[in-house]
Structures are given as structure tokens and as C-alpha cells.
């Protein structure tokens, strides 16, 4: 507890989504699953409310019923959002470039810290070895080299780094918002009509049973993953998803030592 495990899992899932990967998140207990799902469903974007992040929480029949209600609500929230694929691609490219720029800035910052530490160490050695001419001259040359590199790197202000972080976060949230909506809008596609019929079925017991049958079939699972690439469930209920086989690019297992 308190080690930031939930944030690490959330960041891993968001990165996987950005890279168009599918993820299965499983745990022995409900608590860590609910914690991660709640965080991913609570990312705000400007005045548009929460980002409709395409994660679905499955499990026992009660969880499945809630998932079907969530699918219906997400569809209502996103069906009228205008999506421009070319803009999304540009935003993704911009995000990638800004991340690279921020990475390079942080590398420069780390290198500068290391050089400043070396400069300080050399100055102390020169002060200690003033009576050793050869040693002092050698350290003087080293000091010049260090200071030359520091000059090449230049000053790096907190404001410069913070500006990149803030701009990068805003751009990323924009990308997440519209890309998430794009995924959810795939529910409109004719191939997903059978899923929408299950979602809109008025009989709760019947639609849970229908969905459990639906998600066991490989073809249906692959269609479902185009809408919800990130699926969370308990390790006990994971067997309900698809037939035996490989369906996910990544599997995150929390509390793995308790898994059976």
C-alpha cells in the first residue's frame, strides 16, 4: 500500500491504449480492479466532463449487468461527438513529438546535474592538491572540459520543463477524449447490432445471459475489443472471456501470488 501501484497500472493502460494495444487486467480481489477502473473513468477534459475511456469491467452477473448499463450510457454520451480522423492522427503525432522533446529536455537536465556535481568535486580536489602542480594542472583541464559541456547544454529552467508538461498533458487529454469517443462510436456499426440488442434488452436476467454467451465466442470477443480494448475482471471470472486462446497484447495481473 502507498507505493503508487494503482497509478502505475493506470499509466500502463493509458499508454497501451495510445499505442493501440489490447489489455486484460485481472486480480484475485475486486478492490484493485474497481480502483483502477474508477481512476480511468474519472479523467476530466476541459468542460466536457470525463473522458469516455473504453475500459469495461466484467466479472460476475452483477458486474456484467453494470457493464451493459455502462455501455449504453457511454454510447449516449459519445454518439453525437464529431470525430475527425486526420485531426486525431495529427494530435497523436504532436503528442509523440512533444514527448520526445520533453524526454530530451529531461536528459539534458540530468546531464547538467551530473556535470555540476563533477565540477564541484574537481574544485574541491584542486583546493586540496594545490601543492601538487601536475595534479592541479590535470584537474584544471578536466574542469575546463566540464564547464565547456555545461555551456553547451545551457541553463534549463523549471518553467521550461513545466510548460512542456502542461502542454503535453492537455494535448494528450484531447487525444484521449476524441479517440475514446471514436472507439465507443463503433457500437453504431452494423456488425455490432447484435451487441446493441443485448445492451438494450429490457429483461436484465436475459441480457446478462445473452452477453455471457456472446463474449465467449472468439469472433464476438474480437469485435468487442475494437470497442473496448481494455477489459478488467477478476481472475476467477476471466475464463468467461472467449474460448481458450490468445486475445490480448498485454495481461496485467495484480496480486499474482493469489491467482490460481
Predicted regions, residues:
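P-loop NTPase Walker
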Residues: 1-114, 121-124
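Short amphipathic alpha-helical surface micro-motifs
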Residues: 38, 212-215, 258
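Short helix/loop capping segments that flank catalytic or ligand/cofactor-binding pockets
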Residues: 34, 240-243, 260
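Amphipathic coiled-coil/heptad-repeat helices and related helical stalk/stem segments
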Residues: 5, 9, 216-217, 260
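Generic beta-strand/beta-sheet core signal
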Residues: 2, 26-28, 233-235, 251-253
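Conserved helicase NTPase catalytic core signature
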Residues: 124-249
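Short, glycine-/Ser/Thr-/acidic-enriched flexible segments
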Residues: 2, 30, 63, 220, ...
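SF2 helicase catalytic motif II
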Residues: 246-260
Amino acid at each position: 500500500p502507498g507505493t503508487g501501484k494503482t497509478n502505475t497500472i493506470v499509466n500502463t493502460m493509458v499508454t497501451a491504449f495510445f499505442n493501440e494495444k489490447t489489455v486484460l487486467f485481472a486480480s484475485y480481489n475486486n478492490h484493485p480492479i474497481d480502483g483502477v477502473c474508477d481512476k480511468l473513468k474519472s479523467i476530466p477534459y476541459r468542460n466536457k466532463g470525463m473522458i469516455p475511456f473504453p475500459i469495461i469491467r466484467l466479472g460476475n452477473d452483477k458486474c456484467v449487468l453494470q457493464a451493459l448499463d455502462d455501455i449504453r450510457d457511454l454510447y449516449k454520451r459519445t454518439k453525437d461527438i464529431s470525430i475527425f480522423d486526420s485531426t486525431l492522427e495529427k494530435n497523436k503525432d504532436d503528442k509523440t513529438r512533444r514527448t520526445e522533446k520533453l524526454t530530451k529536455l529531461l536528459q539534458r537536465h540530468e546531464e547538467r546535474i551530473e556535470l555540476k556535481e563533477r565540477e564541484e568535486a574537481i574544485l574541491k580536489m584542486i583546493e586540496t592538491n594545490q601543492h601538487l602542480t601536475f595534479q592541479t594542472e590535470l584537474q584544471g583541464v578536466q574542469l575546463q572540459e566540464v564547464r565547456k559541456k555545461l555551456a553547451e547544454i545551457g541553463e534549463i529552467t523549471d518553467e521550461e520543463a513545466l510548460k512542456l508538461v502542461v502542454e503535453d498533458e492537455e494535448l494528450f487529454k484531447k487525444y484521449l477524449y476524441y479517440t475514446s469517443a471514436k472507439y465507443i462510436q463503433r457500437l453504431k456499426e452494423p456488425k455490432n447490432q447484435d451487441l446493441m440488442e443485448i445492451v438494450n434488452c429490457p429483461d436484465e436476467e436475459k441480457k446478462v445471459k445473452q452477453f455471457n454467451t456472446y463474449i465467449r465466442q472468439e469472433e464476438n470477443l474480437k469485435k468487442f475489443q475494437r470497442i473496448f480494448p481494455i477489459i478488467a475482471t477478476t481472475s476467477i471470472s476471466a475464463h468467461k472471456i472467449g474460448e481458450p486462446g490468445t486475445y490480448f497484447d498485454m495481461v496485467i495481473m495484480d496480486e499474482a501470488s493469489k491467482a490460481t
